[in-house]
Amino acid sequence: MAGGTVVTGEFDPLVFQTPWSNTLVVPYVLAAIKDAGHTKIAVISDTGGYGKDGVVVIKEQAPELGLAIVADETFNPGDSDVTAQLTKVKATDAQAVLLWTAGKEGAIALKNARDLGVDLPFYGGSGQARTEFAEGAGAAAEGFVFGTGKSLVPENWGQNTEEYAVVSDFATRYEEAYGEAPDIFAGHAFDAVTLLADALGRAGDDPDATALRDALEKTEGVVGFGGTFTFSPDDHNGLTQKDLALYKIQGGKWILAP
């Protein structure tokens, strides 16, 4: 249940991934940065698996979209201050900052940026699709834009769609069972179980690992929390950019970005 591409890229052929992968989300967010008219970006990421993997994809994709990376700064998971890195960013001619992290340090980075007077638009990915991020950053998160799955706001699918029915039913049953709304990690776990059950139904009696993998690779059009999954021998994530949406934090809550 991780968004790094290393999950399926390094451990194939027996590992499948339900979160929106970096190879899916990074170009989606970079395109949004370009569409906003920016051509020079600063990248700040953590040195954990999600951040390191994301930066690899960012460096591959940014030039293809005509985006120049004018700063590339990192911090370690657990760091309580990112001022030094942001000071370097402030000294560049960056027009936007792409923050790639999944930890609480993302909120710290935004607070540090506002304290330093880094008056640049900040962008991110699925690592910020958590209420803890918006709450932790407080007013510093105002205007932050990030890309992640449409299911963060089920109504994005349209209330008469199968996707909306699946996601809203999952959310209702989760709240009834646990007394709180599900986060994205609960949704990814739900997808893993759904996909496994679907594949087991097609894998024959008493399937071994190879038979189960083969069945998973033939998964087609299974609707889950993350979107519509269609696996193949070359794609163990199975999602597309049609399953994504762009959000903006406004008043401490996320709304669809205009």
List each model region and its residues.
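Extracytoplasmic ligand/sensor domains, especially the bilobed periplasmic-binding protein
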Residues: 1-73, 121-149
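Second-shell loop/turn segments in exported
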Residues: 13-19, 48, 155-161, 178-183, ...
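Hydrophobic alpha-helical segments within soluble ligand-binding/sensing domains
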Residues: 18-40, 81-83, 106, 161-168, ...
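Sec-exported extracytoplasmic/periplasmic mature domains
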Residues: 34-39, 59-67, 87-94, 111-118, ...
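Periplasmic-binding protein-like
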Residues: 40-45, 93-103, 109, 120-125, ...
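Extracellular/periplasmic periplasmic-binding protein-like sensory domains
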Residues: 113-190, 254-256
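Segments of small-molecule ligand-sensing domains
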Residues: 173-186, 197-253
